[in-house]
Amino acid sequence: MAKGQSLQDPFLNALRKERIPVSIYLVNGIKLQGQVESFDQFVILLKNTVSQMVYKHAISTVVPSRALPVAATNPHADADENQ
């Protein structure tokens, strides 16, 4: 698994599981809002009043409406504390 994926997947998965509202800014400046319903290697399914499939290559920034617990986004948090 690529290093980018090892950070990206736990972050998006925590947003999905906790149903945290997010703002997604696209590279063209458009702001999308909703909840992460699902994601894969190439797209994020964003749900608001409708579901939108957003290609990751078009995304600049993902901003959660509230902070995520560090353990939720770092699968190796326990290992880091023991070192």
From Swiss-Prot:
GO terms assigned for molecular function: RNA binding
PROSITE patterns: SM (PS52002)
Domain of life: Bacteria
Alphabetic keyword roster: RNA-binding, Stress response
Domain (Sm) ranges: 9-68
One GO cellular component term noted in the UniProt record for this chain: cytosol
Classification via Pfam families: Hfq (PF17209)
The keyword RNA-binding appears for this protein: yes
SUPFAM superfamilies, per the entry: Sm-like ribonucleoproteins (SSF50182)
PANTHER family: RNA-BINDING PROTEIN HFQ (PTHR34772:SF1)
NCBIfam families: Hfq, PRK00395.1
HAMAP family in alphabetical order: Hfq (MF_00436)
Function text: RNA chaperone that binds small regulatory RNA (sRNAs) and mRNAs to facilitate mRNA translational regulation in response to envelope stress, environmental stress and changes in metabolite concentrations. Also binds with high specificity to tRNAs.
Assembly description: Homohexamer.
The name this protein goes by in its record: RNA-binding protein Hfq
Originating organism: Pseudoalteromonas atlantica (strain T6c / ATCC BAA-1087)
Upper lineage: Bacteria, Pseudomonadati, Pseudomonadota, Gammaproteobacteria, Alteromonadales
Gene name of the record: hfq
